[in-house]
Each structure stands twice: as C-alpha cells, then as structure tokens.
C-alpha cells in the first residue's frame, strides 16, 4: 500500500516520485543497481544496502545539489521521509509566513553519518544547525559531508559523550535561543526488538527495506519511549531556551504515553503529526513552553484505499475442449492459454476495442485494452432496430421508377432540370446513401414521397444513430460512409474531456486444467462498463464453444 498521496503537501516527491529510469541514464553509479523487467519497468532492490545508498546519494545530488558519503555499516536515510520532517518543522516555526531573512537556529540530536537534516535545512532555508553525535564514525562522516558541501558556516557538528541529549550540548551556548530541535531517536530497546522477533505483529509482512544502522543509531536503553522521555525531562529544565522541541517516532504505540507524559508535566503546547512515504509511516511529536506559538493543524484522517480486486472469470477445461474441436481439421492445436487469448482478441476486434499485446511472465498472456466507445451493450437490440429501420426506409413510387428507364433517363432528367430547376433524379440505391441519409433532401423526389422520407429521417436524427440505417448486404460499408459524411461523434463520455471510457490490463493465465481471465482496471471512473465488457467476453467464449 503506497502512502505517497498523504505526504506533506510541500514535499517535492508527493506528486512526482523519483524517476529511476532518468536517474539511471544520468548517474552511472546508480544505474548499476537498477533492474529492468520484461515489461521495461525499472525497479530497485531496497533490501540491498548498496542500492539504497546509491538512491539517497543520487536524489540529494539531483534535487538539492548535495554530495555526501555514507558508510554501509551506518544508517542510510531515505530522502522523502527526512524532507517530510523538515517541512513539518517549517510549519511549527511558521517559517513561510514570517520574515525569511531572520536567522533560524535548530539542533539536530544524533545527526548521523549523513548529517541529512542540517544539510537539507541549510540548503533549502538557510537555517543554522548545531548537530550533535556520539559515534566516532558518524561524527567524522558528518563533518566531511558538511565541509565538502561548503556549509561549515551554517552547520556546526559537535562530538558529545554517550547519553548526551540537550543539557550538555547547550552548556557552551547559554545565551542563544534556538527555534527548534529535531531528533530521530533509536527505535529499539534490544537486538530481538530490532530484528522484529518480539515487537512485530506476526501477521504483518516483513520490512521492504534493509536496516543498516549502527548500535547507537537503532538501539537505546528502553527504546524510543525512554529516549524521548529523557528529552522531555531536559526540556523541563531548558524550557524557553528552545521554542519547539520535536522528535520522530517509529512506533505509533509510543505516541499516547509520551503525550500523557507531557500532560502530566504541564506542558502548555503539544502538537503531533504523521509522515507518509512509500510503504513507511512515521509519527512526530512536538511541544513548546511558549504560550503564543501557533500549533499547526493536525493531520486529516486518512481514508485507506482498498485495493481494487480484478474482475475474473474462468474458462473451464470442458469449454476449452469444445473450442479446440471448432478448429479447422489438420491445424495445429495451440496451448489452452493461447486458444482462449485468440478468442478474446477476435471478440475485441469485432467490438472495435483497441488492444495490444504487452510483455508478461511465462505461461501467461496479457493485453492492454483501451475502450473508446460502448460497443458491447444491447448488441442484439441494435440488430433488431437496424432490421426494423430497413423495413421502414422510404421507396420511390413505381411509376417514378418505370420512368427512369435507360433509354429515357437523359431526356427525362433534362426536362425536369429545365422546368423546375431540380437536380437530376438518381437510382434508389444512390438516393439512400450519402447526403440523403444525413439530411432529408425532398427536392430530388416527387412531392408524394417527401413526407414519407422526412419522417424517418427526423427520428434518426433525434436518436443520433444514422449509422444504423443501412441495407443488410451493405451494412458495414454504408455505416462507415454515413459516419464519415455525417461527422458523428464517438461514444466516449461527453463533457468529461476523456477520449476513452476506461483502460485495463487483461491477463490470461493457467489455473490447473482451466484458464483464468483477469481484468485489472488501470484508468477510468466507471467500473460498471468494464464489468459489462468482462461479462460479454465470457458469454461470447461460451457461445463460440457451443455454437
């Protein structure tokens, strides 16, 4: 279940996720980690730490102009998630509605090897950061990343003793008021919890990405709950030295007890939010001792979108045998999947539903369908209507037809042209085609035939179905001519601005001795039409087998 639609509204990846194909074409170091399947779809193995690191470094380079190095044995941050946190801090300090020239100061508790929060905050907003770190490897990489991006004037990386949070870090800068602090605390209390042995619901699927964090980055005594409580206790001493204290949580169950702790301590302002990105969800908590600060609006309740199930029907083995018997004698008998797929292609061609073969896995056939008009509903009724309308077509009187003998044709037409100025009369087959079928033209027939001709033509125009008025032996050609001459619109939905009714992928696959047909909706609002087409295809396959 992808959560990108619920990202922070200012997150650049909300509506435009990273284009792996483009990034691979531009960055060779990223290209070596990209996989391309038979359908041409580009993907990345998020369980490979080298691939995750390549993606993070490539996104920072492409979208923010930042060059960083991250060791594989330390935490590799994902850019969209960190960007969500930065944007929420902007909301907390009312950054976009205030004087942007004023210097904003922040603290990043446990900045990590990437130093990603200070790098993003300084690059996007020009914020000043005090970044603390307890791990030697992370500290050295963080300093290097700041220096190679020429941000030493805005970011100060400080090595602090173990278990140092805010109090010891601010001893040397006792006069400075900071606007905020950020923290991505260690989520787990022990190794078993970090591996998901005793903390993860057994019904949940395993994580989709790899965890490369070091011991100090992913584990702390008491887990994230106790870690954040220590920050709360530091804030009770520092109080208004910081306008906002904040932290990000990896477990929803940590949020309620921490909010209760803040309530018990009498903290006046508390805010929380949720971060969505990819298949990952995080929670954030912030509190302030300033009465005048404005709390951002809480996140809206997110409606979970249930995945749409495909429309499915099964072609039984007995039906497949009947279809095989219909094949011409002596022809090669195809596989059951191919046989059913060929039947479906013929049905779609007869319906004029656009379709093309798309790459798929073994023992499977896939078609991409684009339906631009509803050509499968009420087909039998349409045939009856055409037959009825053929019987109602006006015919010229017998005396008029007899007067059009070949010997007298030229003389008769010239006399009519001289006397009345009317155009020459033509044969019946010509009078039914082209202009007369679209617009009643009474001057080419005697007055006695005019009422009979105009009445059915008005009915045709009111129904907008002139292509249904045709002879049995010329039905197809006449219908096409009439569509061209009358300029009839297609059956696509009017006023919607969409040139199609729906798009879907049709899969034909083996299921034991039967064949399974699935239709997956790709685009289009009306699933009823797709359901109608699915039912029609199923019924036609049965008719082909039993006819």
Swiss-Prot record:
Give EC number(s), comma-separated: 2.1.1.348, 2.1.1.346
Q: What is its main location?
A: nucleus
Q: Where is this region: Disordered?
A: 383-473
The Polar residues compositionally biased stretches are 431-447
Which residue ranges does the record annotate as region K-loop? 163-167
Q: Reply yes or no: does the keyword RNA-binding apply.
A: yes
Give me the Gene Ontology terms describing cellular component: cytoplasm; nucleus
Annotated S-adenosyl-L-methionine binding lies at 82, 110, 114, 133, 164, 184
RNA-binding, as annotated region = 17-20, 199-211, 250-254, 277-283
Tell me the segments the record calls region VCR 1: 289-398
- UniProt keyword Phosphoprotein present: no
What this protein catalyses is: adenosine in U6 snRNA + S-adenosyl-L-methionine = N(6)-methyladenosine in U6 snRNA + S-adenosyl-L-homocysteine + H(+); an adenosine in mRNA + S-adenosyl-L-methionine = an N(6)-methyladenosine in mRNA + S-adenosyl-L-homocysteine + H(+)
Keywords noted in UniProt? Cytoplasm, Methyltransferase, Nucleus, RNA-binding, S-adenosyl-L-methionine, Transferase
The known regulators of its activity are described as: Methyltransferase activity is autoinhibited by the K-loop region that blocks S-adenosyl-L-methionine-binding. Upon activation, K-loop changes conformation, allowing S-adenosyl-L-methionine-binding and subsequent methyltransferase activity. mRNA N6-adenosine-methyltransferase activity is inhibited by zinc.
Localization per record: Nucleus; Cytoplasm
Which segments carry the region annotation VCR 2? 500-547
Summarizing the function annotation, the protein's role is:
RNA N6-methyltransferase that methylates adenosine residues at the N(6) position of a subset of RNAs and is involved in S-adenosyl-L-methionine homeostasis by regulating expression of MAT2A transcripts. Able to N6-methylate a subset of mRNAs and U6 small nuclear RNAs (U6 snRNAs). In contrast to the METTL3-METTL14 heterodimer, only able to methylate a limited number of RNAs: requires both a 5'UACAGAGAA-3' nonamer sequence and a specific RNA structure.
Q: What is this protein called?
A: RNA N(6)-adenosine-methyltransferase mettl16
Organism whose genome encodes this protein: Xenopus laevis
């Amino acid at each position: 279940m992808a959560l990108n639609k619920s990202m922070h509204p200012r997150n650049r990846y909300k509506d435009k996720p990273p284009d792996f194909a483009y990034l691979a074409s531009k960055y060779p170091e990223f290209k070596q980690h990209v996989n391309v399947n038979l359908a041409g779809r580009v993907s990345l193995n998020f369980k490979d730490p080298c691939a995750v690191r390549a993606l993070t470094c490539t996104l920072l380079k492409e979208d923010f102009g930042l060059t960083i190095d991250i060791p594989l044995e330390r935490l590799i941050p994902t850019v969209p998630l960190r960007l969500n946190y930065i944007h929420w801090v902007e909301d907390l300090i009312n950054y976009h509605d205030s004087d942007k020239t004023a210097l904003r100061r922040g603290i990043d508790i446990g900045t990590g090897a990437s130093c990603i929060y200070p790098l993003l905050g300084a690059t996007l907003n020009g914020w000043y950061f005090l970044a603390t770190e307890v791990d030697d490897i992370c500290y050295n990489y963080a300093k290097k990343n700041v220096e190679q991006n020429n941000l030493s004037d805005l970011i100060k990386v400080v090595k602090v003793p173990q278990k140092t949070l805010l109090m010891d870090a601010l001893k040397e800068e006792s006069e400075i008021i900071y606007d905020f602090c950020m923290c991505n605390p260690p989520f787990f209390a022990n190794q078993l919890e970090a591996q998901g042995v005793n903390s993860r619901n057994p019904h949940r699927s395993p994580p989709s990405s790899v965890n490369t964090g070091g011991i100090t980055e992913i584990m702390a005594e008491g887990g994230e709950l106790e870690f954040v409580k220590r920050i709360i206790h530091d804030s009770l001493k520092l109080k208004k030295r910081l306008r906002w204290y904040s932290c990000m949580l990896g477990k929803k169950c940590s949020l309620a007890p921490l909010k209760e702790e803040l309530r018990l301590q009498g903290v006046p302002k508390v805010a929380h939010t949720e971060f969505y990105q990819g298949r990952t969800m995080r929670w954030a908590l912030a509190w302030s001792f300033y009465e005048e600060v404005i709390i951002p609006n809480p996140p809206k309740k997110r409606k979970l979108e249930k995945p749409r199930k495909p429309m499915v029907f099964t072609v039984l083995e007995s039906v497949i045998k009947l279809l095989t018997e219909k094949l011409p004698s002596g022809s090669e008998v195809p596989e059951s999947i191919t046989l059913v797929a060929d039947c479906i292609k013929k049905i779609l061609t007869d319906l004029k539903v656009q379709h093309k073969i798309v790459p798929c896995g073994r023992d499977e056939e896939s078609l991409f369908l684009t339906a631009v008009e509803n050509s499968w509903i009420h087909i039998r009724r349409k045939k009856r209507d055409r037959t009825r309308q053929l019987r109602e077509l006006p015919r010229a009187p017998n005396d008029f037809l007899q007067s059009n003998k070949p010997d007298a044709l030229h003389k008769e037409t010239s006399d009519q042209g001289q006397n009345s100025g009317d155009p020459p009369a033509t044969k019946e087959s010509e009078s039914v085609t082209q202009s007369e079928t679209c617009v009643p033209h009474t001057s080419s027939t005697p007055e006695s035939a005019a009422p009979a001709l105009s009445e059915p033509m008005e009915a045709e125009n009111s129904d907008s179905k002139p292509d249904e008025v045709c002879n049995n032996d010329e039905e197809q050609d006449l219908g096409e001519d009439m569509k061209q001459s009358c300029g009839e619109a297609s059956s696509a939905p009017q006023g919607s601005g969409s040139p199609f009714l729906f798009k879907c992928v049709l899969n034909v696959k083996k299921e034991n001795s039967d064949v399974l047909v699935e239709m997956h909706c790709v685009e289009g609002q009306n699933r009823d039409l797709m359901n109608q087409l699915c039912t029609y295809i199923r019924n036609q396959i049965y008719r082909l087998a039993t006819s």
